[in-house]
Amino acid sequence: MTDLVIRPLAVGEEALFESLPDPGLVGFAAFGDTYSGMAAAGEYRPDWTWVALRDGVVVARAAWWAGPKDADPLALDWFDFTDADAAAQLLRTSPLYAQYSLKLPPGWRDIPAVREQAQARIDAAVAAGLSPLVERFRYRWTPDCGVPARPGRLEFRPEPDDAAVLDVFRRIHQGSLDVHVRRTIAATGLEAAAQEELDYLRWLPSPREWWRLAYNPAGELVGLSVPGRHYGDPLIGYIGVVPEHRGHGYAYDLLVEATHMLADEGVDRIVAGTDQTNVPMAAHFARAGYPIAQERIDLI
């Protein structure tokens, strides 16, 4: 067997990346996206796109994504191969690291061919040193889903002071069901987790003025609702309720408010997500008319 060559793409080598045979059952390909199309739109950089070749033939590929101003990749979201060992070696050899987010069709475990493709990628990522963290639901709202009526229980106010919002994150993160948040708290503490959330919202290329704090009729803070825009889609950027007001379904009110704000902007879609283990939030998305468009497995 000839030696494996692992390297980043050169400019103009998109066709080489796409020469790998792939049935398109998982990942972006399962949803009609192509690497060349996304790269042309500025989603990927050649030096963050790697291939493993044997005798000049691509046997594994990986592409890391980030926003246009980011200095480091934020996600590994193309990872395909015909040789699992080469794929694991590619991830170990590349100097790049980010969470691997494997996109899957809803109910993927019930489709044998899809389940096989998904498990192969998980196994290769684990062989490279990654570990499964959480499975998530990904939602896609469109105007045909309808805009749910506002419950009218809360008052929503803008909050321009980042320090005030950071303090809200400190409160919301206490007892959070979000697996990523819980992991960050365990690793680096509550303050770091709160700052990470604020940094993410500041990173989004959507107006800061959209952020809303929610208050009950007694004037008590209930939570935070943030509609936003990613580099690709309008999205629900954040929904969170402070511990003392949990158990009353207020996350639904926050979700509805964010949906109304984006709908009023005339968007034709809203994407959102939650951990599959966050049963209350998943129920709120269902009640608000958000259909599950994808499932996703995150490995770190």
Predicted regions, residues:
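Short acidic/polar active-site loop segments enriched in Thr and Asp
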Residues: 96-98, 268, 291
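Flexible, substrate/cofactor-facing loop regions flanked by secondary structure
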Residues: 30, 34, 149-234
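Conserved acetyl-CoA-binding loop-helix of GNAT-fold acetyltransferases
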Residues: 84-97, 241, 247-264, 279-287
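Acyl-donor-binding surface of acyltransferase catalytic domains
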Residues: 82-160, 299-300
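A structural microfeature
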Residues: 60, 134-135, 222-223, 294
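Conserved donor-binding loop and adjoining core beta-sheet/short helix segment
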Residues: 21-24, 33-108, 217, 223-234, ...
